[in-house]
Amino acid sequence: MKVVIIGGVAGGATAAARLRRLDERAEIIILERTGYVSYANCGLPYYVGGVITDREELTLQTPEGFRNRFGIDVRVGQEAVELRPEQHTVTVRRLEDGSTYALHYDKLLLSPGARPVRPNLPGEDDPRVFTLRTVEDTLRIRAYLDEHPVRRAVVVGGGFIGLEMAENLVHAGVHTTLLQRGAQVLPPLDADMAAEIHAYLRGQGVELRLGARVSGFSPQGDGLAVELEGGERFPADLVLLGIGVAPDTELARRAGLALGVKGAISVDGQMRTSAPDVYAVGDAVEVRHFVTGAKSHIALAGPANKQGRIAADHICGRRSAYTGALGTSVLKLFDLTAASTGLNEKQARAAGVAYDKVVTYSASHASYYPGARNMTVKTLFDPASGRILGAQIVGFDGVDKRMDVLAAAIRAGLTAEQLTELDLAYAPPYGSAKDPVNMAGYVIENVRAGLVEQHHWDAVAELPADGSVILLDVRTPGEVRKQGLLRSDALHIPLDELRGRLGELDKGKKIYVNCYSGLRSYLACRILSQHGFQCSNLSGGWRFWSYNATDRTHDAAPTHLCGVPTGKD
């Protein structure tokens, strides 16, 4: 059996290695148009910023290494330019001299990946305007930084690459402006979770502009000007375009393969395309979203590796199927970590999925042990069954392991009640007896059981100001002096004084309660409801509201963590 693989990196290289483990006699050829067959493309920004200092560390496997260990024929600098499925042949161009040759296959696997989106703007071809996708791109950017006095950089786009490059340019001592066309960075998060990232970025010295529509690039002195619609200009010595990626499917399109979402290659559960004996994996294919079942384009290394393994299994006659992706992702941004899995609100609404949500605020480990840091956890769930649909976390230590637990929970179809029962590793330096994952389950359980009604940050401004409802703040006097009230018409009664001051409240008016994070206001709601008051708890508390409704700065201090008692001041 002769298997030709077009493209290496995650999906193609994984498939090749799996094929060899399953079939020692197969002839396996990898065609890779770059000079690197298997490299850590997720690590490229960190070489630019100097975090990774040895570029050889980015190379996971060399052509020689593949040949020696796996007996695989790796042909770098060679590009597949034409695919003829009916003839089982592919035309290959040697990039060094432009010569071509035909290559026959029994099975073909496409792993062309994705290409950076270029918006085709005036001045975009200036050599100081870069994209980042390959090792060669990385070396060009690093060389430019080394050889030129780069003082100011503009990053266009606030996705994963844009944010990671902004961080690493700051690490390299470059004043960095990030221009994002939309109203938020990091689209896998909902806007209310991204708000904390906006505050944090600005606190790290990144000049962040949202709603910034770039119209072109033009020379300005010794550098460039990045021009916005409306005429505003940002000076730059270097520009990085990080506005997303698109499936690199031109070869597949010309060959007549069926394409789907965003032009990605349509495949079945065994990663087979519409052409006989042709498979496809990685960032170029559409997949089934595990929660909704809908076709999606999810360009991540984890799914690409799994798909490569499954395609290899099927080529070798093994029963294996890809059942879908959750889109689980994590981002390091200076000291901050942001992660998500499953559905966010935008996706749930688009798919017509019924959902409810809770926002909880927990410590990374036992708050009495030094170094505890906060994390904000937003969890979406099915209001009828309690099944977990999606989660987002923004915080510091321990975000990744909680997200992994929640991703596994969604995959297993767990409900909120089952989250409360998870027996997770605990010792004071590592976690809490009530882990942040357990806490999310407890809060959902309370909401579904009718123990508390909740409202969200965007409802605060819409609450009547005519005295027909009561806004009750149960924080300490010191907190209120420092942070202020949600609204000037709010009533302040500290939680520990509430039982003795119930007479100040009107049972004929609904009470909307808040504290700093949502825990003490929940306790207040339990007191009030059992004394005949109708009340609602502000999910996420003052802290979550303030990131979304004000221009507050980021506060990473472990203030009023869940479960920590507070005094009067």
Place the predicted regions along the sequence by residue.
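Beta1-alpha1 glycine-rich phosphate/pyrophosphate-binding loop at the start
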Residues: 1-74, 79, 117, 166-189, ...
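A Rossmann-like FAD-binding core segment of flavoenzymes
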Residues: 25-27, 69, 75-96, 103, ...
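Short hydrophobic core segments
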Residues: 6, 80, 103-113, 156, ...
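Rhodanese-like catalytic fold shared by cysteine-dependent sulfurtransferases
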Residues: 417-469, 477-510, 516-569
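FAD-site-proximal beta/loop scaffold in flavoenzymes
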Residues: 125-149, 221, 225-227, 232-313, ...
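Mid-to-C-terminal Rossmann-like scaffold of FAD/NAD(P)H-dependent oxidoreductases
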Residues: 1, 8, 284-397, 428-432, ...
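Glycine-rich dinucleotide-binding loop and its adjacent helix/turn
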Residues: 110-172, 207, 267-269, 491-495, ...
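Rossmann-like dinucleotide-binding cores of NAD(P)H-dependent redox enzymes
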Residues: 59, 152, 160-218, 299-304, ...
